[in-house]
Amino acid sequence: MKKIAIFLFEGAELFEIASFTDIFGWNNIVGLKEFRDIKVETISYKEEIKCTWGGVLKAEKLVTENNIEEIFSYDALVIPGGFGGANFFKDKENEIFKKLVKHFYENNKIIVAICTAVINLVE
């Protein structure tokens, strides 16, 4: 089974999150059989995030220093973009996020940053 973690930042764009959950969700039902075994999970350093235009999402998995190693086993890290006016860039220096990105980068794992999320990768 392949596992994809979608990292939720405060102020993320709901559509940019939903595109991954929807595509891979449907893929597991109607996609080619050899690609159906993909698990997508939303993760964050917060239990809930408020999206750009007000929707609230609860992360499926809260990532802490105690369980970050579990996320290191995932195959890909997706970072949806967001809006600065909704505090999207406020927590880009979060240590948990930085450790995840560093691990995925150093281990040649897939990192997908959508739109403004690229800014959160710049150090």
Regions found by a protein language model. Name each.
Residues 1-109, 119-123:
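Extended, subdomain-level signal for the structured scaffold at the beginning of enzyme domains
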Residues 114-115:
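Short, thiol/selenol-centered motifs that function as redox-active sites or metal-ligating centers
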